A protein has these predicted regions:
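Interfacial catalytic loop of ABC nucleotide-binding domains
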Residues: 76, 100, 121, 138-140
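Helix-to-loop junction immediately C-terminal to a conserved catalytic motif
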Residues: 54
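Short helical segment in ABC ATPase nucleotide-binding domains corresponding to the A-loop/adjacent helical element
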Residues: 93, 102-110, 120, 124
Length: 151
């Protein structure tokens, strides 16, 4: 699987007084089997660039190609792109946003279009693997300890 960014530009709040260019004409190619490191100062655009790789956000201009195909050409194919390109955040415990532990873990499978039964099976299995039992399912994710959140 190769990923290409061609002249990628991303502008936040474009056309407003808060306009901020986060990425400016970035061109990059990642070949199949290649590993890269992305480093930079706070606010340099690292997270913005990463969010483009699986279509979480769309560029202001330029294109993202997955195996030569523009990922934004057909919005219906974004689900498949996201199955192929996953993101792992540095501090995943800061990415919690659902009201319950169960719903937070179910977010991914739900957005992949799994059935309710498959979602339940995946959530229970995932939580069991990391040692979080059913007594936590209906609690807020923010009631978990730091270690539990990371798991």
């Amino acid at each position: 699987m190769s990923i290409q960014l061609n002249h990628l530009t991303h502008v936040y709040n474009e056309g407003t007084t808060f306009e901020k260019v986060a990425l400016n004409d970035v061109t990059l190619e990642i070949q199949t089997g290649e590993f890269i490191g992305l480093i930079g100062h706070t606010g340099s655009g690292k997270s913005t660039l990463i969010q483009h790789l699986n279509g979480i956000i769309s560029p202001s201009s330029g294109e993202i190609l997955l195996d030569g195909e523009n990922i934004h050409k057909d919005k219906a194919k974004l689900k498949e792109v996201r199955r192929r390109i996953g993101l792992a955040f540095q501090y995943p415990e800061y990415q919690l946003f659902e009201m319950t532990v169960y719903k937070d873990v179910a977010f991914g499978p739900t957005n992949l279009g799994l059935s309710a039964e498959q979602i339940h099976e995946n959530v229970v299995a995932a939580l069991n693997i990391v040692g979080i039992d059913e007594t936590f399912y209906e609690k807020s994710p923010f009631e978990l300890s730091g270690g539990q959140k990371r798991r």
